[in-house]
Amino acid sequence: MKGFFVTGTDTGVGKTFIACGLAALLKEQHVDVGVFKPFLSGELASDPQSDTALLKNMSETPLTDEEVTPFIFKEPLAPYTAAKLEGRTVGLEDAVNHWKKIKDRHECFIVEGAGGIAVPLGEDYFVSDLIKALDLPAVIVARPNLGTINHTYLTAQYAKQMGIRVIGIVINGISSRPGLDEQTNPDMIERFCGVPLLGVTPKLEDASPTQIHHMIKDHVDVSLIMNQMQMGAEK
């Protein structure tokens, strides 16, 4: 099947905005797209402001909250830590089994992780292991400012070492008046990471669905993502 996994260099880099905008744009291009965010911490999926609600809204999937996000934890912590505090255990096979139940409901899926690529989801597995288990390529979302070259390079190299195909990188949240760091980091990241720079997206003051949609449409090369997905599906 077609699809990709949106991961990040850290928490709070804008994975949900990027995933939502890509879902909306693919939908606009008549792609039957679904969304899957298996782990959610510190929010209720039914909350209209939750990541799950935004993903469902912008993809227009008929999947239920529970199908999109089967594992929800009260505390805003790494899923493994949050689950331990509740006396719960979620194994990799549990996440994969939920995926198998929905993966044929849409032609294409956008899956969003939790935090960065090495965040622990369970006792013996990380986000990277989930990406591998779902057999999807990855889109990495990175921040634009000082220090991001190091974090993005480490994320991309780790993904490659894990055998994860990286479609490209989106640098999200660049300011309206970027300093030298934000001006120079995109070129350095593309050069050193050795994967395509899919786009550099602005910091949104109004993160409404419409603004998110236009941000992706104006600043991200979605055709490159589609081509990379097609190449992967044909292998």
UniProtKB/Swiss-Prot annotation:
Its cofactor is Mg(2+). Keywords: ATP-binding, Biotin biosynthesis, Cytoplasm, Ligase, Magnesium, Metal-binding, Nucleotide-binding. The lineage of its organism: Bacteria, Bacillati, Bacillota, Bacilli, Bacillales. Catalyzes a mechanistically unusual reaction, the ATP-dependent insertion of CO2 between the N7 and N8 nitrogen atoms of 7,8-diaminopelargonic acid (DAPA, also called 7,8-diammoniononanoate) to form a ureido ring. ATP binds at residues 12-17, 51, 112-115, 202-204. It is found in: Cytoplasm. This is ATP-dependent dethiobiotin synthetase BioD. Belongs to the dethiobiotin synthetase family. Gene3D superfamilies: P-loop containing nucleotide triphosphate hydrolases. Pathway: Cofactor biosynthesis; biotin biosynthesis; biotin from 7,8-diaminononanoate: step 1/2. GO terms for molecular function: ATP binding; dethiobiotin synthase activity; magnesium ion binding. It comes from Bacillus licheniformis (strain ATCC 14580 / DSM 13 / JCM 2505 / CCUG 7422 / NBRC 12200 / NCIMB 9375 / NCTC 10341 / NRRL NRS-1264 / Gibson 46). One of its GO terms (biological process) is biotin biosynthetic process. It comes from the Bacteria. The active site is at residue 37. Substrate binds at residue 41. Its EC number is 6.3.3.3. Homodimer. Mg(2+) binds at residues 16, 51, 112. The keyword Glycoprotein does not apply. GO terms for cellular component: cytosol.
